[in-house]
Amino acid sequence: TEGPDFYIPMVNTTGVVRSPYEYPQYYLVNPAAYAVLGAYMFFLIIVGFPINFLTLYVTLEHKKLRTPLNYILLNLAVADLFMVIGGFTTTMYSSMHGYFVLGRLGCNIEGFFATLGGMISLWSLAVLAIERWVVVCKPISNFRFGENHAIMGVSLTWVMALACTVPPLVGWSRYIPEGMQCACGIDYYTRAEGYNNESFVIYMFTFHFLFPMFIIFFCYGRLLCAVKEAAAAQQESETTQRAEREVTRMVILMVIGYLVCWLPYASVAWFIFTHKGSEFGPLFMAVPSFFAKSSSIYNPIIYICMNKQFRQCMITTLFCGKNPFEGQEEDSSTKTEASSASSVSPA
């Protein structure tokens, strides 16, 4: 059922369909599902906000972490905070009422920040891949990655993300409630007059999903080949090679985490867009959508768990300047220092 600013995945034969901005949508799914949704959003908030804020705080507190190669990882944390503050809080509040209580303006705000965070994350991973490729594979001779290059990379992520999230606010496509009608996203569902949804969805999938994905896979493919060749030739010490492989595993795991979170959402959205008129329930879009939001806790967890230097700094911060595990981490510190010397470590 299509309304002026919404689309309900249900045929209104019984006359029960109501605007998701004004009435509870309990006729779509069991009311208990909204409680589960609210609890899940609360979990993402209480985990996502502290861990991303801690990522920023620890990096800013410890000078040795404030390197150009870490700028893009700070950008990832900022993007996740945008999703937590601007997206998850409104979704949790709406789920408590069973409909999107914040109205049309609130839908635009929630949809904008949630999509902005996702796009910044995707483009940050693309820029991160380019940076690693340039540093490790050295496709440009005599090139030294510096602060200006890092700032340019961060700026690129914001420009590209805004190029995807601003158009729906000014008439090229739009943000509407989706799934269980408690969160908003791009209108993949309708061909409403005056919004040119078809062209925007094609533009979004081509330039803001497939293109950065190509960059990520190309750069990491070349990086893996370079690391393998270096290990085979034993051009560097075993410790350095081990540290470089550790960094490679970290960034690859970050990409896998992103794909696990966002690929189902993108696939379902594309299916809905290319199968106009097909019947699908609210959970068909809601489950991938809310599963995708868990990406806000993937990146910092992966970064903290797989980067020994960052983990040491985090422990020092949490224990007020002391590291109770200093003896256990001594060997790890040596490996990370070797990684830093090779200009591959993200710390």
Swiss-Prot record:
Biased composition (Low complexity): 335-347
UniProt-listed InterPro entries: GPCR_opsins, GPCR_Rhodpsn, GPCR_Rhodpsn_7TM, Opsin, Retinal_BS, Rhodopsin, Rhodopsin_N
Compartment(s) where it occurs, according to its Swiss-Prot or TrEMBL record: Membrane; Cell projection, Cilium, Photoreceptor outer segment
Motif placement: 'Ionic lock' involved in activated form stabilization: 131-133
Residues spanning the membrane: 34-58, 71-93, 108-130, 150-170, 200-221, 250-271, 284-305
PANTHER family: OPSIN
Name of the protein described by the UniProt record: Rhodopsin
Source taxonomy: Eukaryota, Metazoa, Chordata, Craniata, Vertebrata
